[in-house]
């Protein structure tokens, strides 16, 4: 027979069930309301040979998903699959390219019962399926899958999505407060160094800054400013 037990506080609790293992997260409103529920059919997967791991949760029709760091397309992520890797995606399409330069495995969900956040503490390459996949043998679901490591996650709840931000910052730490001198504009490009009249292009850039009254604290030639054939390099060994 299925067994269950409850662990929680005055504002948040988790109901843990076995056969198979799954969890239901609830927050206190006027009564206890569910904000996240593991898929009842195989919520957790651990590949004994591949090392891959996965976590599947129930997707309700009115759930809306946000977060994941720098991603293309709308801020509302529902219905897409996102690859959590870092690439130099030069020339990417702002509406569809994935992955991009940086990501954060923190997913926020707006539910009918409040906001729910889940942060996966795993450094390997991973993927989020936010409703793009449909499987006849399971209820509608979302998934997180990682190539290696543990299924190790943190959860948080709030009345509104914006209230989740202070909570994740308490966990990961605040961004460093920049000094005033670091807030200026720094120009950067690879285009000028490719031009046959590179020196003229650089001086023209300075003239344009003056024309439009744009202050500029520094300028760099960016990555790839040396070349060998068709390839770019940060520097070239002699």
Q: Which stretches of residues belong to each language-model region?
A:
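Aromatic- and carboxylate-enriched substrate-binding clefts and catalytic-loop regions
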Residues: 28, 43, 215-238
């Amino acid at each position: 027979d299925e067994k269950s037990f409850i662990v929680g506080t005055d504002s948040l609790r988790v109901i843990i069930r076995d056969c198979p293992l799954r969890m239901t997260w609830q927050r206190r409103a006027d009564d206890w309301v569910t904000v996240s529920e593991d898929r009842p059919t195989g919520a957790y997967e651990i590949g004994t040979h591949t090392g891959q791991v996965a976590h599947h949760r129930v997707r309700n029709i009115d759930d809306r998903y946000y977060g994941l760091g720098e991603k293309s397309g709308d801020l509302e992520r529902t219905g897409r699959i996102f690859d959590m890797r870092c690439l130099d995606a030069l020339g990417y399409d702002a509406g569809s390219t994935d992955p991009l330069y940086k990501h954060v495995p923190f997913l926020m969900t707006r539910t009918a019962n409040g906001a729910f956040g889940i942060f996966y503490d795993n450094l390997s390459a991973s993927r989020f399926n936010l409703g793009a996949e449909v499987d006849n043998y399971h209820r509608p679901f979302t998934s997180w899958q990682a190539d290696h490591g543990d299924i190790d996650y943190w959860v948080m709840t709030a009345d509104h999505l914006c209230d989740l931000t202070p909570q994740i910052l308490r966990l990961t730490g605040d961004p460093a407060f920049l000094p005033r001198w670091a807030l200026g504009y720094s120009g950067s490009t690879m285009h000028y160094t490719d031009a046959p009249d590179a020196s003229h292009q650089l001086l023209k850039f300075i003239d344009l800054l003056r024309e439009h009254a744009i202050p500029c604290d520094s300028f760099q030639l960016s990555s790839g400013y040396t070349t060998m054939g068709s390839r770019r390099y940060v520097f070239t060994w002699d």
